[in-house]
Amino acid sequence: MHRHDCFKTPADEDELDDIDDDMVVGVIAEIEQEVLNESESDDDEYDLADMGAPEPERNDGNISSNESISSDGSFDPNAEDTDSDDSMLDEAATAGASIAKRRKEQNAMDGAEPSGSGPSGSGDYSHLDEDDETDETVRAMIAAIKKPRSAPPEIRLEDFITDICFHPERDIIALATIIGDVHLYEYGNEENKLLRSIEVHAKACRDVEFTEDGRSLITCSKDKCVMVTDMETEKLKKLYETAHDDAINKLHVLDERLFATGDDAGTVKLWDFRTKDAIFELKEVEDQITQMLTNEQNKLLLATSADGYLTTFNIGARKLYVQSEPYEEELNCMGIYRGSSKLVVGTSKGRLYTYNWGYFGYHCDMYPGVKSPISLMIPITDRIACVAGEDGNIRACHIAPYRNLGVVGQHNMPIESLDINSSGELLASSSHNNDVRFWNVKYFEDFGDIKYNEKHNAYKDKRHNLPSSKCTNASDFFADMTKEQDDDDNDDGGNNTTAAGSNNVT
């Protein structure tokens, strides 16, 4: 609340014989008390802070109250006696009452609640209008606040999320947890709805996948079991008890009949839903299987491992096809690009190795990538990949030639899993913070192909925030303001030209 603690008085006291300082202070206190009573709000400090000091209406023939109180130079001791002090008090009372009335009407329109105090706990910015603001920065902030959502809100669980998987046909995402449960959420831009929670395994559920028709869930666990569960009835359809001798780390669905599993000791097994036992198994590495992959023909099954090998199995012949030279780093993830002609593998040193399809003995190209380990990779288009890892950032890169396109999204902690929906427009990621975030990546459809000799700034590319990122580039934030300023300048220039032209016309 603003108070006037000291009044400036002229040197000649005869001009204000009828004015008592104590009386003026008393009247001001009465006015402020009336404003407090009229506000009818429990949060008086909030209202008065927003109301500020009363500003009387300016008249051409009178001196404003602010000038008469706080400005020494505006007082003329030789001026004629007037009722300026009395009029000052009257105008202050009128202005204070008017502001309090407008404040009361605004509270009534907003439900008599300050922003953010509603039942939902989130601020209501519907009454904000950027057209009413004169400050360009404030207008830009209001526009950003009122921007409609393009992706679902985040999902947060109490338990650690080990893996996520999108449903192939419906807007449903499955979340596997460290306690062995699977949570099914129906997602949407406005809200996410928990459909059901299924208790599947006794130990950590390490991987979850949907069958191609979306009717069943396949899960593998640290308890060495593989389970096939009906998504609607939550009933167990098939149990592969003790499917491996070691904890199972990864599984991959090949088609409606076949799926593969890999464990912590490097064993890979191929399964048929119609049989009880595995079709075949091979052990060619000594460390954890980190990912498995096939192309559309399903003739070759590729597996990366933590001991630095890329191993390829011939599914039809049920034997080893080829194994790469050993790398002094973990091979964590991979993806197929360029019309199934290129295989790209991400490593624990942040590198990206490229292989020509069918020639998996040694890479044909290497891109340094980022300095942090790459543990996850998702193909977005035939030429664009999203990679993530321990630094908490999801980055997009162009494949052949390699280019960093920018940051798609970010987490506060290392990212654990990554998946994209069937339409290719929505990317989901989970982190060690037990949260799942969604990123709309539809804008990648408009990205053109990059030429080998095209100039670029690698430093800026790594730090550039793409439209889906929660962080905004400073240049993007002020871009609209600069554009509006340029438009205003052009309009002024046009008006000046028109005026000059009219002056030249005789």
Curated annotation (Swiss-Prot):
Transmembrane feature ranges: none
InterPro entries on file: WD40/YVTN_repeat-like_dom_sf (IPR015943), WD40_repeat_CS (IPR019775), WD40_repeat_dom_sf (IPR036322), WD40_rpt (IPR001680), WDR55_POC1 (IPR050505)
Segments of skewed composition (Basic and acidic residues): 1-11
Ranges of compositional bias, category Low complexity: 61-74, 493-506
Keywords: Repeat, WD repeat
Region (Disordered): 1-20, 33-87, 100-132, 480-506
Claim: Repeat is one of the keywords in the record: yes
Family of this protein: Belongs to the WD repeat WDR55 family.
Name of the featured protein: WD repeat-containing protein 55 homolog
Organism per entry: Drosophila mojavensis
